[in-house]
Structure formats: C-alpha cells, structure tokens
C-alpha cells in the first residue's frame, strides 16, 4: 500500500511540474492594471507581426511592424500617410526614411522592447494585428474580438506553460 501511495504521489508531483514548466513561446497580452493574461499568440523567433491602428486625429491607418527576437519585440518600421500628433517628425541616426506609394515609411534599427503598452482604441476602435509566421499565410485579427475598447494591455514575448496555454485565449 505504501508503495502505491508513493508512486501516486511522485506521479502527481511530476504531472504538476510538467504542466507548469515554460514550454511554448508566445506574444502575450496582459491586462494593463492587473497583469492578468487576456490572450496569447504562439510566435517563434523571427516571426513578425504588424499592429495597425487608426490615428485618432487624421483618421488614417498607421502601421507599426515588429519581429520576435529572442524574448524581445524588435520594432522594424512605422508607416503612415499624414504627419500629425504622435507621428515621427524627424529621422534619427540609424533610421531610414522613404516616401513610397503615398505613404511615409520610417525604418528603425536596434529598437527592442521587453514589453510594450498598447491601448485598444475607444473612440476610433479599429486596431488590427497582422500575423506573419514563417510557413503560414499572413492573417489579420481584430483587437475588438479579444480586447475591450479603451483598455490598455502590456504586450511581451513569454514562454508559457501548458497550464497557461490551457487556461488562456489563443488568438486565431
């Protein structure tokens, strides 16, 4: 009897450890104030994504492009059609500017984030996430399908355990 109890106990401990080990890398969205995981999107090193939002003043799309680099988010480019509040006004060392097809493109280098704060638009709520995973077709997800308009979220690259994957909402 003691042997069965010992085996069951060791098995339970192994299962608990297994489901709590960091396992899969993902782009994780946490509620800004509580840091509770709201949604995640599996992303590997080198996968890319764009965040597209409508500028609240001139009501045109702004695209920010990122690449997953290790446990960080690397910003690559900002694309917009009009200058305005919050838009880059000058090119800094290491950046490259290009005006193409009626759009301003600012290519940046060496801009890395451990995490970023993003507010889902409230007045003009049309934020989109364009997913560019290697070996898959590009797809676009609407923020409002996962997030409350007007709320803010901390976005980071994390290794999630099986437990976190099971209880979280995968963005599809």
Where are these regions (language model features)?
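N-terminal hydrophobic targeting signals that begin at the initiator methionine
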Residues: 1-3
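Hydrophobic membrane-insertion alpha-helices, especially the h-region
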Residues: 5-22
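Alpha-helical transmembrane signal-anchor/signal-peptide segments
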Residues: 25-37
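Short, hydrophobic/aromatic-rich segments at coil-to-beta transitions
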Residues: 26, 45-51
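Active-site-adjacent structural patch at catalytic or cofactor/ligand-binding sites
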Residues: 39-42
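Extracytoplasmic/periplasmic/luminal assembly and interaction segments
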Residues: 50-90
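Mature, soluble, non-transmembrane domains
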Residues: 89-172
């Amino acid at each position: 009897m003691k042997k069965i109890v010992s085996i069951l106990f060791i098995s339970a401990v192994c299962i608990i450890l297994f489901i709590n080990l960091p396992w899969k890398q993902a782009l994780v969205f946490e509620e800004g104030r509580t840091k509770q995981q709201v949604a995640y999107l599996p992303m590997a090193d080198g996968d890319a994504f764009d965040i597209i939002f409508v500028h609240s003043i001139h009501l045109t799309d702004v695209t920010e492009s990122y690449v997953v680099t290790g446990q960080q988010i690397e910003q690559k480019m900002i694309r917009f059609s009009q200058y305005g509040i919050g838009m880059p006004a000058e090119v800094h060392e290491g950046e490259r500017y290009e005006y193409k097809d009626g759009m301003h493109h600012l290519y940046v280098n060496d801009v890395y984030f451990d995490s970023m704060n993003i507010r889902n638009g409230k007045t003009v709520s049309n934020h989109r996430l364009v997913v560019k995973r290697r070996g898959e077709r590009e797809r676009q997800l609407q923020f409002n399908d996962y997030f409350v308009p007007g709320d803010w979220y901390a976005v980071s690259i994390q290794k999630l355990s099986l437990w976190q994957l099971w209880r979280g909402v995968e963005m599809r």
